[in-house]
Amino acid sequence: LGRLGVNVTFISETGNDKVGDIILKFMRENGVSTDHVNVFPEGKSPVSLAFLNEQNDAEYLFYKDYPRLRLDVTMPEIHRDDIVMIGSYYAVTPQLRDKVKELLDKAREKGAIIYYDVNFRSTHKNEAIKLLPVILENFEYADIIRGSVEDFENMFGLTDADKVYKSKIEFYCPHFICTHGGKGIRLYTKNIKKHYEADPLQTVSTVGAGDNFNAGVVFGLLKYRIRRDDLDELSEDDLA
């Protein structure tokens, strides 16, 4: 998004170390503001390693050494129809809940579009029941929920997108995108229920695939000037 000239701000944290320096430098060089990234003096920048299997899908290992005080940042200004994206374990971890809720409350108050990419890894599958109240609270805040079949299998033990939508999503948020790798995408809104095929391709790596998908959705919302109040009225003609 930054490379496409979109005004992007990243809210996160990193350590005061070489890994953190690389992360911040990369974001700045690619048009992403780091004004709201907390550089903590204690602890180390978290590192994740991706290992590709035979299908070039990634399995991850995470290394973390966080300080006691987390995400000590001032939240950015938010305006109506801005797009605020949250996701992954960062959006549900108890240590950051107060700060995440501060952001979500501000986004809701200002009338921004809240986009929630659940991205619930298998490494946290054993915490799914404990984290369920926070996950559902995020669903309630969200205007758009995006997740993969694997995410919902890890969270709910469900792999059927229709069942996920009807039993877990629709009550909280009517706008849902479920991705299933090469098997395509299912889109649900108040007026649309549709499956979109994925073009076949030779995958080199799936690292960052979900992030790129999210960026594409956000860019589409911006390009076609879709506002928060427009979401309930979207039809297939709008998506053609």
Task: Map each language-model feature to its residues.
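Alpha-helix C-terminal capping segments
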Residues: L1-N7, A50-L52, G220-L222
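A short, aliphatic-rich alpha-helical micro-motif
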Residues: E77-H79, N138-F139, E170
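Conserved N-terminal subdomain of the carbohydrate kinase-like
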Residues: N7, I11-S88
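Conserved phosphate-binding/catalytic region of the ribokinase-like
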Residues: D105, T159-A240
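Structural motif
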Residues: D82-I83, I144, H175
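Short, conserved phosphate/pyrophosphate- and ester-handling motifs at nucleotide-, phospho-/glycolipid
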Residues: L1, S148, G210
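Conserved beta-alpha-beta core of the PfkB/ribokinase-like small-molecule kinase fold
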Residues: V92-K166, G182-G184
